């Protein structure tokens, strides 16, 4: 028996929600360890769709404990709204099935406002990142700057005013520079005190809770948000998110030691998508790209933004296998490729006349790379709902094997539709 860390191996939107839900039946605890409510996923259970963006996937399954770790930035208003929305769908959420790290950073209204102001200014200069404008980045900045308001601070009204003064000293200086009205001390105090009673019942010393449960033999599933190529260090900087999204963050963002993380499962889409700005070597702007977007329903769960689509990039996923220490992958949306006469897989790049096997870190070099492809024959038969290798066309199996060989990691799970049971299990990560 082992614990499992689930990470996206591309630019997010790989189908982590379904896989995490599928694995959560085998887990006792599901932990979010980074990001905020900027990355959403949809779970389909018995025909009912649940849209989550902050809460761990395990929260919709009875008998599971959901944990929001210290690596997550928590918007208390978004948290309350998501709890209320799920409650209206019949999901019970109490401290018996949800814990929030007392040292997790809070997202405030001033973070959202700063995020939007920066994006607007960057749009005018052509340098926008394409954030969700939800305050994620500014909240992480305050965390690193040691001026953040944390969950535990809601319980200490004696020291809270001084902490509000500290964060406002920074933000009001920024707002003056941007020509925007300053935020009053009372506005932030009112904002925090209005949510305290709703948030504080869920707070816990998460690292201690997880350590005790681990020692009792609990199976723990760590749920990553976004994808490895959006990692603040290892992604396509500066077009990245504001946190570490690789598997190592599961330890830092939960307080559990890295030796206890276990199996690293990389969720990998059978083609490539990206939301927002940034390099995308295999992007298709032709009818095939449109086909992938329409058939794959490539629109963001949180923002509704249309995703850019392209061929599978084995060079990029190979990079993610290395930076995450991926044990095996879950290959998703294979069924979207049904009907294409031929398929291409990127195996490397040409850069200034030289062949390279990885995407360079330099923004300028990333813009100049040209993908090198291998071409495979497609298949006409449907793979939708396949639950065994015998259900797959020969060419689909060949495609999967080619992916495994090129990225240097085996397929542990294969997903053939949004339905959780339409999954081919090769290796159970919890039993590895």
Curated annotation (Swiss-Prot):
Write down the Gene3D superfamilies for this protein, in alphabetical order.
Answer: Adenylosuccinate Synthetase, subunit A, domain 1 (3.40.440.10), Adenylosuccinate Synthetase, subunit A, domain 2 (1.10.300.10), Adenylosuccinate Synthetase, subunit A, domain 3 (3.90.170.10)
Any idea which UniProt keywords this protein has? Cytoplasm, GTP-binding, Ligase, Magnesium, Metal-binding, Nucleotide-binding, Purine biosynthesis
TM spans (from-to): none
Residues binding Mg(2+) are: 13, 40
Q: Where in the cell is it found?
A: Cytoplasm
Q: Tell me the active site.
A: 13 (proton acceptor), 41 (proton donor)
Report residues binding IMP: 13-16, 38-41, 132, 146, 226, 241, 305
Q: Which GO terms describe its biological process?
A: 'de novo' AMP biosynthetic process; IMP metabolic process
> Enzyme class, one word?
ligase
Q: What cofactor(s) does the depicted protein rely on?
A: Mg(2+)
Cofactor binding notes: Binds 1 Mg(2+) ion per subunit.
Reactions the enzyme catalyzes? IMP + L-aspartate + GTP = N(6)-(1,2-dicarboxyethyl)-AMP + GDP + phosphate + 2 H(+)
Query: What EC number(s) does the entry state?
Result: 6.3.4.4
Tell me the pathway.
Purine metabolism; AMP biosynthesis via de novo pathway; AMP from IMP: step 1/2
Give the matching InterPro entries: Adenylosuccin_syn_GTP-bd (IPR018220), Adenylosuccin_syn_Lys_AS (IPR033128), Adenylosuccinate_synth_dom1 (IPR042109), Adenylosuccinate_synth_dom2 (IPR042110), Adenylosuccinate_synth_dom3 (IPR042111), Adenylosuccinate_synthetase (IPR001114), P-loop_NTPase (IPR027417)
Binding of GTP: at which residues?
A: 12-18, 40-42, 307, 333-335, 415-417
A GO molecular function assigned to this protein is:
magnesium ion binding
Where is substrate annotated to bind? 301-307
Domain of life from the UniProt record: Bacteria
What is stated as this protein's family in its record?
Belongs to the adenylosuccinate synthetase family.
**What PANTHER family would the database entry show?**
ADENYLOSUCCINATE SYNTHETASE
Q: Main role?
A: Plays an important role in the de novo pathway of purine nucleotide biosynthesis. Catalyzes the first committed step in the biosynthesis of AMP from IMP.
Q: How does it assemble?
A: Homodimer.
Task: From the Swiss-Prot or TrEMBL record, give the protein name.
Answer: Adenylosuccinate synthetase
Give the originating organism: Rhizobium etli (strain ATCC 51251 / DSM 11541 / JCM 21823 / NBRC 15573 / CFN 42)
Q: What is the lineage of its organism?
A: Bacteria, Pseudomonadati, Pseudomonadota, Alphaproteobacteria, Hyphomicrobiales
